[in-house]
Amino acid sequence: MHTLEMLLLLLLLLPLALGEGDGQAVAGDRNPSEARSTHEHFLQRLIRLIHGSDCQPCGQYVCCPPWKYAEYRRFT
């Protein structure tokens, strides 16, 4: 597998490893919106690490180089 595919697989399995995948609430767990926000923040940090400083967020979980970001903004 390629590195990017491995990272995506890891991201898909991460909620299961954290215990958020079974859907059962346990006293003291974070509420779902807070957990989702934390997971999205983690994904954005990971994307920035992969793409480096050229990263411009151009969609949900999508990181584009600056020249692609300008094209994306023009069509949205």
Curated annotation (Swiss-Prot):
The organism's taxonomic lineage, starting at the top: Eukaryota, Metazoa, Spiralia, Lophotrochozoa, Mollusca
Position of the signal peptide: 1-19
Keywords for this protein: Cleavage on pair of basic residues, Disulfide bond, Secreted, Signal, Toxin
Domain notes: The cysteine framework is XVI (C-C-CC).
Chief localisation class: secreted
Cysteines engaged in disulfide bonds, as pairs: 55-64, 58-63
GO CC terms of this entry: extracellular region
Tissues where the protein occurs: Expressed by the venom duct.
Family in the record: Belongs to the conotoxin Q superfamily.
Superkingdom as given in the UniProt entry: Eukaryota
GO molecular function: toxin activity
Protein location: Secreted
Keyword Methyltransferase: no
Propeptide: 20-48, 73-76
Key word Signal present: yes
Name of this chain's protein: Conotoxin Fla16d
Organism: Conus flavidus
